[in-house]
Amino acid sequence: MKLTRGLFLLMFLGRMNASAFAAEKLIADYGGHAGFQSATWIGRDLRIFEKHGLDVEIVMITGAARSVAALLGNSTHFATGSATGPLAAAVRGSDLKVLAASYNKFPYAFVVKPEIRNPKELRGKRVNILNYGGSNDLALQLALKEWGMKLSDVQVIIGGDAPTRMGALMSGRIDATILSPPHLTIVAKAGYRILADMGDMSANFTQSSLYVKGSSLKENRDRVKRFLRGYAEAIHVIKTDRVRTMKVFANRMRIDDPETVRTTYEYFAPRFSFPPRVNLDGVRDTINFYAEQNPDFKNRKPEEFVDQSLMDELDKEGFFKKLGQ
């Protein structure tokens, strides 16, 4: 009888321990199948988040507005994407904070039909972007501004993720679009003209950021910190582990051509930010740009939208230094 009770107690305690150490289930989004959006893929597919006690499901949500809506509606716990979405929502009163950024430059190139030889020949042409208010929109407007043109000088076509826009360009339904590898690599090989690499533009930009609801940061700070650890470790893997990263790239991007996978990796890996701190100049440039059109952005400071306190904690604890050893 005593033996039976002892076995029952051991089984009960075993279940308690398994439950206590079970990974916490969370949902994070990613914006598409381009290399700059890969931090969450790597964290999930290489089981990095599990090392930090998290069972993370990742879902694709295209467009900043949809990503913000999913986060505010509690459909996701963490959102990733350009800072335009959380900034635009925050100036309207939404409780959002940008915590980190894996990519602090535009990753795009402006691609056109071969017969378009310079920016002035874009006048009246059909330019396809994902949506208004996102990084595609801002990249287009900043490029036109550098070329001395206005948005009204072109026909803006809205809709379509990167593969869809690539297909529209190659089928002749549009004249120009904004792409990054691997889609940029494919169209360049096919003879389409790269009019400008937006990474070379003077403007800084928080392209791939990690953001959460401010209430989550306060109420679930440890959980958010563990996710940030996994996110940062995934970025470190991208920059240092070519073989494993390229396998994930090939799978997630559905690319069979090893050369395209290689060029995509070589384009993005050096440009990732590690540690993934937000470049406040990029946030400031975005605020200043939107302030010309929206008075809500006037006299606002990056620090109102960005909270890097967890980044500071991880830095102080030596987390980033340990990953680099």
PLM features: residue spans?
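Sec/Tat signal peptide C-region and signal peptidase I cleavage site
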Residues: 17-22
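Ligand-binding clefts/hinges and TM-proximal coupling segments of bilobed small-molecule sensing domains
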Residues: 134-150, 154, 229-260, 303-306, ...
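Secondary-structure end/capping motifs
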Residues: 218-299
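Pocket-lining segment of extracytoplasmic ligand-binding domains
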Residues: 84-85, 157, 163-254
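Hydrophobic helical h-region of N-terminal Sec-dependent signal peptides
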Residues: 8-12, 16
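Conserved C-terminal helix/tail region of periplasmic/extracytoplasmic solute-binding proteins
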Residues: 288-325
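Short, glycine-/small- and polar/acidic-enriched structural segments
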Residues: 23-171, 175-181, 194-198, 203-204
